[in-house]
């Protein structure tokens, strides 16, 4: 199948997907990661303006790994991305979860607030609203358990004090246990473009 990674960074995920047999394309806003994708993996990653050059309804999967929260013009980007998906194509969004246990624990020190580069903080109900608005079906929500440890470590850096690694490991563990399988520090939303979608 055909896969687009929007916000592909330095190309690690694209390279993995290609090794699994996917025909891959990448879009990345920053010049340096695009160059790194070329030098490390021989991937031709394009700037966001190249989205218009992709044929409508031609892609099976579009991934956005921790990207949507950085997008200033949310509606325009979502509409543009969805227009490239085939009917029943899948959109995969990885996003920080402001309702997670570690977000509530760290409060204003929670690293995933990441202001000012995060324009949005999506709760599950926000993704459900976007799905409804843009003709998508929310198929599944998955935890990203390792993010709880990473975000806790960054958050401990903001809090200050001693034993940051130990505290972060403990808080990350507790956050994952308390998540109940569906409320970790970061969540992956798997959405399907409905036959009547954009």
Identify the residue ranges that each predicted region occupies:
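Conserved SAM-binding loop
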Residues: 1-107, 121-134, 144-146, 185-193
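N-terminal start-of-chain detector that recognizes signal peptides
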Residues: 16-18, 92-93, 111, 159-165
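Homeobox/homeodomain signature
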Residues: 44, 109-112, 164, 177
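Short glycine/proline- and charge-enriched loop/turn segments
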Residues: 106-115, 154-161
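A C-terminal cap/extension of S-adenosyl-L-methionine-dependent methyltransferases
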Residues: 140-198
């Amino acid at each position: 199948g055909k896969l687009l990674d929007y916000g592909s960074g330095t190309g690690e995920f694209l390279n993995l997907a290609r090794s699994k047999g996917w025909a891959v394309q990448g879009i990345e806003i920053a010049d340096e990661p695009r160059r790194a994708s070329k030098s490390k993996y021989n991937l031709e990653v394009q700037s966001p303006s190249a989205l218009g050059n992709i044929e409508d309804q031609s892609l099976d999967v579009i991934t956005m790994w921790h990207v949507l929260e950085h997008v200033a013009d949310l509606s325009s980007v979502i509409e543009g991305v969805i227009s490239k998906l085939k009917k029943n194509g899948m959109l995969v969004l990885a996003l920080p979860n402001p309702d997670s246990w570690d977000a509530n624990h760290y409060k204003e020190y929670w690293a995933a607030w990441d202001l000012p580069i995060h324009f949005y903080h999506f709760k599950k109900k926000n993704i459900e609203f976007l799905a409804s608005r843009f003709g998508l079906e929310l198929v599944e929500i998955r935890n990203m358990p390792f993010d709880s440890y990473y975000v806790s470590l960054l958050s401990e850096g903001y809090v200050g004090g001693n034993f940051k690694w130990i505290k972060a490991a403990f808080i990350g563990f507790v956050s994952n246990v308390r998540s109940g399988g569906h409320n970790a520090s970061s969540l992956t939303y798997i959405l399907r473009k409905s036959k009547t979608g954009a």
